[in-house]
Structure formats: structure tokens, C-alpha cells
């Protein structure tokens, strides 16, 4: 453009034509009539920095949803193996829960003594219940699958951290 033309991006819903036979020419004439009458309002087009920020925040949202999905998948896997951590731990992905899951991924089961070692702070009030909730067992494939799920969760957290630094 040579600077003599003003471009307006308008919402199509704001320029509905009367029903009937439609052609591109009739639509163009109708839009020109609305524009001359001052009845078309341009849509908001954010600046380039705002558009970039929106891209990042949308991607951040999708990563957060991915993390939630991954956590649900891990919890379901643990429960299918007989580990009911979420019954007694408020956040199974907190310090205590994650330590127990890492141990399970390595060995496939956890002893009451190991539970004592991994359970921290507030969760200690429910220590006996937690010991009962972790009486399941994992075979080699289930342990490997848990390792993969935990690794994927960690990678998602790393991506989230990178995006948040950019935002």
C-alpha cells in the first residue's frame, strides 16, 4: 500500500445482508454501503508484541492441560497397580508422593520402612494410612511405564518453566 488506503478488518456478523440470492458483487456493494454510512466498526487487531504474548500464553495453557492429563494418567496407573496414594496424600505429586513414586518406579514395591523415609512434614500425621495405601506391586513393564510417565511429566514441567520465562 502507498499509504493512501485505510484497511478495515470487520466482523462478518456485523454486516449481514438481507436474505435472498447472494453474489460476491452484491456482498461487496452492501459492504461498501455500510462503510460509507459509517456503520462498520473495525475489529480489534492487537499489536505484534501482544500477538506474540497471546501465542505464548495459549501454549502455556496447553502445557498446563497436558500436565494435568499426565498426572491423571500416572494416578490411574498407580491405582491399577494397587497403590492408592491419593486416598491419604493431598497432593501425590508433592515431595512425599513424588519420592514414593520414584521409589516405585525403581523397585516396583515399597516397604513400610521406606515409607517412613520418604514421607515428609504434614503427611507424617497419616503415616499408618499411607503404609496401608502402598501395598500394591508392579512388574517390570509397569515400572518401566511409570518411569516413562514420570519422565514425560518432568519434561512438561521443564517446557512450562521455559514458556513462563518468556512470558
What are these regions (language model features)?
Residues 1-167:
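A detector of single, family-specific signature residues
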Amino acid at each position: 500500500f502507498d499509504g493512501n488506503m485505510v484497511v478495515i478488518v470487520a466482523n462478518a456478523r456485523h454486516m449481514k445482508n438481507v436474505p435472498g440470492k447472494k453474489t460476491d458483487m452484491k456482498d461487496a456493494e452492501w459492504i461498501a454501503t455500510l462503510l460509507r454510512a459509517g456503520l462498520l466498526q473495525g475489529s480489534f487487531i492487537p499489536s505484534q508484541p501482544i500477538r506474540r504474548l497471546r501465542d505464548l500464553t495459549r501454549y502455556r495453557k496447553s502445557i498446563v492441560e497436558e500436565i494435568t492429563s499426565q498426572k491423571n494418567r500416572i494416578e490411574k496407573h498407580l491405582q491399577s497397580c494397587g497403590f492408592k496414594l491419593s486416598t491419604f496424600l493431598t497432593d501425590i505429586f508433592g515431595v512425599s508422593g513424588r519420592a514414593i513414586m520414584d521409589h516405585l518406579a525403581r523397585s516396583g514395591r515399597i516397604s513400610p520402612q521406606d515409607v517412613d523415609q520418604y514421607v515428609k512434614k504434614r503427611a507424617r500425621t497419616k503415616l499408618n494410612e499411607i503404609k496401608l495405601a502402598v501395598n500394591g506391586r508392579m512388574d517390570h513393564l509397569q515400572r518401566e511405564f511409570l518411569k516413562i510417565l514420570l519422565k514425560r511429566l518432568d519434561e512438561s514441567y521443564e517446557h512450562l518453566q521455559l514458556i513462563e520465562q518468556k512470558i
